[in-house]
Curated annotation (Swiss-Prot):
This is Probable [Fe-S]-dependent transcriptional repressor. HAMAP family: FeoC (MF_01586). It holds the Pfam family FeoC. It comes from Yersinia enterocolitica serotype O:8 / biotype 1B (strain NCTC 13174 / 8081). One of its GO terms (molecular function) is DNA binding. Iron-sulfur cluster binds at C56, C61, C64, C71. Keywords: DNA-binding, Iron, Iron-sulfur, Metal-binding, Repressor, Transcription, Transcription regulation. InterPro entries: FeoC, Tscrpt_reg_HTH_FeoC, WH-like_DNA-bd_sf, WH_DNA-bd_sf. Belongs to the FeoC family. It comes from the Bacteria. May function as a transcriptional regulator that controls feoABC expression.
């Protein structure tokens, strides 16, 4: 099982990633990955970014029942510390 550090490192290596990508990459259950992402976000190590679905070819992702579950609208990346 991956640790918080391994999850953070996986995000760092890819630049940004969504929970599904990380779940598959680290062979971890999605609910566990989501909980770990929330923890890293609360710790200030990563940031949660909601993507705009306006780039969808049909423009209907926001109202499509399948789109709400299958279109990834949230990605995570390392937080810039200035």
């Amino acid at each position: 099982m991956a640790s918080l550090v391994q999850l953070r490192d996986a995000i760092a290596l890819s630049g940004s990633a969504d929970a599904n990508q990380l779940s598959h990459q680290l062979a971890m259950p999605l609910p566990l990955v989501e909980a770990m992402l929330e923890k890293l976000t609360a710790m200030g190590k990563i940031e949660r970014i909601e993507q705009d679905n306006s780039g969808c070819l049909t423009g209907s992702c926001k109202s499509c029942p399948e789109g709400k579950n299958q279109c990834s609208t949230v990605i995570y990346q390392l937080k810039n510390h200035r």
